Amino acid sequence: MYTLQNEALSVDVLDPVADRERFGTRYCTGGYIFQVTDASVGPLLSGPTYPDSFNTFDGQGIPDAFNQSPLKDPKSTDARALIIGIGRCDLEKNEVEEFCSWEVRQTETGIRMHTEQEFAHFALSLTREVELYGRTVRSSITLNNTGRRPIPIRWFPHPFYPQTEGDELCRLNIPVSFPENDGYALADSGFIARKNWPHWDKGYYQALAHEAHSNLVVLQKHPAVGLVAATCSYVPNFFPIWGNKNTFSWEPFLERSAAAGQHLSWSIDYEF
């Protein structure tokens, strides 16, 4: 595990090789933020099974995923595909056959991970950077299409925050709506709030309807530091939220297509 640290925070980032037992077919193996710890109050992130256990599907901290757009020949019946940031996978068996290799460079304020992947006429390079400045953790991604085929991208972050004492969870800078449901409501304050707490053992998932035209900013209630924030560099597409008794998370998807020779870059600033 790699660690970035200053007087306020320490950030643990999984090592793509040494921490391989923590990876599966879901989350990107480079730039996986496993925990952010406040020097005064302790760990700031959670997970669906945290702190009791860990599994590669649920994860913890701030993982992110490209797994919903596996790359394969559309004419092939083979179950093998390339998952960006993970490697060659067997989709039927839900197994990683060969992990991608990362070049890692760490400085005082950041970690840079770079990999190149090829499969079935797809080719790409992917660079992940995690940087720590004061109380801000920046996670950034650059993807270059170095092959001949367009690369579909359906990526999402999955930051896991601990549940709060009150029912208010997060507030967004974009108008959202959703149907009546058992898990969530829009409070008069503008925050998305819990319903039926503490009966959340099974968890609640809800897609948000929105017509965003600007990049997303999220204010998130936090039991240890009061309020944290996140600023996305992109306009979200599909946008669900999810939580259970241990954690709450929002998942603003980025959906794009990278043409041959094209590169895309985006980032999220997490402010603690």
Which stretches of residues belong to each language-model region?
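Short, solvent-exposed secondary-structure boundary/capping segments
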Residues: 153-154
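Surface-exposed acidic/polar loop and edge beta-strand patches at domain peripheries
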Residues: 1-136, 146-149, 158-272
